Amino acid sequence: MKESVLCVDIGTTSLKVGLISADGEVVFICTKKFKDCYSHFISLEWKICLQNAVKDLHDSGVCTEFEINAIVVSGNGPTLVSQEGFTFLWNEKIDFSVFSDFCEQAQNELKKSLFLPRIVTFKKLYPQYLEDKIIFSGPEFLIYELTQKAVTILPEERFISAYWTNENLSLCKIDFQKIPPFIEIGKICGKLTKSAASYLGLPSDLPVVSGGPDFVAALIGTDTLQNGTLCDRCGSSEGFNFASSVFLQDKNVRSLPSVVKDLWNASVLIPESANLSKKERLLEAKKAIDILRSLAEQNKVSFPAKMTATGGQAKDLSLLKEKSVVTGMQIEICQCADAELLGDACAGFTALQKFENIRAAAKKIVKKNSINKELL
């Protein structure tokens, strides 16, 4: 039988599941919508949706040809989930008034971190912080349900300021014993427990692998891991992500480390772009690319003539055609529009030691096709 990994990505409104082989064949894919996206216990739906997806997978018959060698989990963040499943989603408001409760040093750390302000808000607003022993990020909660192993996925060591250190947790009066230890992307977190295996209808002792935050999984799944590559991650919101060997700084740009040690990711975000008119959306896309191109030129970094589109809007070929014309960029799409799943596959096969590292896995697994020949 051919080797494959079961890729799971937790979104805000749905769970996406794909079965992908080591050479990038997307054997099976499905989406399971959540019943109540606004519930504070939405995380309890994740395993149910995964069970339903696995049932569809078995019903499809592909498992007679492809063996599942691992499960990989990625998901939205910075979502927080208590041990009993109480969920504080990434898009819920932070109570910034709590900053005044801390010393100046702690306030500075809160401003740097994506997670600390949310943990502090969670602690202040919800009794579940005190009642439960562990506080997880989103995908790590599902990993815990599958393995009973508590971890926090750190995409790369330079992300530490966006997460936390024990010193920063102490400064912000957060009990570090509630926060699971870090693990890298593409590592085996644990094995599927007998009860989880029975629930899902999968073999017990199946490795469960860290896929990481969804935006990082998407960058891996579009192979935006080389200097001078560009990805348009477009859904309800939109982000243009440029991989650079130079740290690019601008008031309109958010720069974070790449999952690859010698690169940075510079991004321009368009919040709620799906709510804009098509004309507004395209003009904002052009503006974002112009910002990144200008910044790259100022720093003598080569800027590409093409970009890879992923996400919901990437399934709209008519929109992509217009975007290509307006932005002057050639556009490529991957064999799976939901590149997070491809990124999960890269993490999974790296953990299984089929590839030396994530970058090598992406080179083999990610396939791209230009839309321009067909549409322009």
PLM regions: where:
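Gly/Ser/Thr-rich active-site cleft segment
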Residues: 10-12, 107-213, 277
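Activation-segment/catalytic-loop signature of the eukaryotic protein kinase fold
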Residues: 277-335, 340
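Glycine-rich phosphate-binding loop of actin/hexokinase-like ATP-binding domains
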Residues: 80-100, 136-140, 145-167, 206-280
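N-terminal glycine/serine-rich phosphate-binding loop of ATP-dependent small-molecule kinases
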Residues: 1-85, 131, 198, 206-210, ...
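Phosphate/pyrophosphate-binding loops at sites that engage ATP/ADP/AMP, CoA/4′-phosphopantetheine
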Residues: 51-69, 125-129, 168-176, 200, ...
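Active-site phosphate-binding/coordination module
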Residues: 64-119
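Glycine-rich phosphate-binding/hydrolytic loop that grips phosphoryl groups
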Residues: 217-221, 270-271, 321, 332-367
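Glycine-rich beta-strand-to-loop/alpha-helix junction loops that act as flexible
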Residues: 73-78, 185-186, 234-236, 305-315
